[in-house]
Amino acid sequence: MLRINRISNLRTFGQRFFSTEQQDVVVIGGGPGGYVAGIKAGQLGMKVTVVEKRGKLGGTCLNVGCIPSKALLNASHLYEEATTKMSKYGVKCSGVELDLGAMMQYKDKSVSGLTSGIEGLFKKNKVKYDKGFGKITGPNTVEVTLNDGSVKTIETKNIVIATGSEVTSLPNVNIDEESIISSTGALALKSVPKKLIVIGGGVIGLELGSVWSRLGSETTVVEFTNRIAAGADGEVAKKFQKSLEKQHMKFHLETKVTSVVKKSDGKVTVTVEQVGAGGFTGTLEADAVLVSVGRRPNTSGLGLESVGIPTDKAGRVEVGDHFNTKVPSIFAIGDAIRGPMLAHKAEEEGIAIIEQIHNGGGHVNYGAIPSIIYTHPEVAWVGKTEEELQKEGIQYNIGRFPFVANSRAKTNDDVEGFVKFLAAKDSDRVLGAHIMGTNAGELIGECVLAMEYGASCEDIARTCHGHPTLSEAVKEAAMDAYDKPIHM
């Protein structure tokens, strides 16, 4: 028996420290960039392993970001419709109550179905999946500490860093995910806070603030700059804020948070001070505070220093035009590198880097990456804003069309917002597109396609669009940029 135990222990020791594999590509990170890279590599016949420490594929986006937030945005919107609007359509809703537990179950089911779907795609495309933490130990080696505690080394021709990002907080603000929460905590609250303060007026803060506002929270957004929705066109941002204010969300712009203190009763006091003409100085009380001030790359502990790969002050891996680091066999994509922290940007990079490794191809047009805020109304944009064009001295024409003049929007009783095109004055080529309104996130796709292929506003306007559809507003806005719209 003693001899058998010794043999067993030696075998375990060997598996723990000396297990090696040979691969063409190892992808560290199983989020949108990483899992897409893994699938693409499998499709191209490469031997590929994706290493993900979470134990679930999909990264922040699928597990505690894009997907669960959209589920709650949808559910909370339906709840608000049932309590405020359905009767005008002849649908009488009596005794409407919020079952937050059931809503959270719906959210969780949406997530679990998609994570298991990715695992199915891995099997279909022969992608190996290691649940554990990957660390670079050489130009062609990755040490994986598996979640069961065992350790193995993978030898590979190429390494792709796709480790994503994590929530960042304010100095001296401790996120406990109870009263002081990050986006992760805001997706899993056990009850609706009577008062909610959102620190940060960006995409995440506005979306999650909107969810809890619809469900009954008195929601206040505190933003350091003089506008919400950074990156959006200025005209759109102003009208968007007014829309959210009509939905009873409050805003303190040009206001700095100086302290966040949790009291013994669990409530939170937020002290703020004015940093601009429109700012506010004082204290705010809340049952919950959502800290939504940005994210930082997940690059610490990867072993980058051991192979001489530098990062910038924000922790982003420094790469060249083809995602290449200073080590020829190591690449980086997604939130780990420069650029907007967007899942779809990472997905495009995931495909591009594998094509680059495979045959030297692979390209991402960063001038045609859309941004979307999934509130109601939605806000979406691609390309240049007016402010950017003015700063660059580029002359342009503007085309606008309001949804109030769109027949489908009228029949849907949802006419808030507009479509706006910015087109080059000399060529009519689309330079930017900005939409505020229902399904803006779906409508922006046509505009992205137009920019990808260098289309003009006239090209869009002379393309037949179905009637009645919201997409006709895109056509009419394009028509307004070079001529005159028909229905306005």
Curated annotation (Swiss-Prot):
Keyword Transit peptide belongs to the record: yes
> What are the cysteine partners in each disulfide bond?
C61-C66
Task: Tell me which GO cellular component terms the UniProt record holds.
Answer: extracellular matrix; mitochondrial matrix; mitochondrion; oxoglutarate dehydrogenase complex; phagocytic vesicle; pyruvate dehydrogenase complex
Q: Which reaction does it catalyse?
A: N(6)-[(R)-dihydrolipoyl]-L-lysyl-[protein] + NAD(+) = N(6)-[(R)-lipoyl]-L-lysyl-[protein] + NADH + H(+)
Q: Where in the cell is it found?
A: Mitochondrion matrix
Where FAD binds, per the record, is at 52-61, 70, 134, 163-165, 335, 341-344
- One Pfam annotation reads Pyr_redox_2
Main localization category: mitochondrion
One biological process GO term for this chain? pyruvate metabolic process
Q: In its UniProt entry, what is this protein called?
A: Dihydrolipoyl dehydrogenase, mitochondrial
Recorded source organism is Dictyostelium discoideum
Its lineage opens with:
Eukaryota, Amoebozoa, Evosea, Eumycetozoa, Dictyostelia
Q: Report which gene this protein is encoded by.
A: lpd
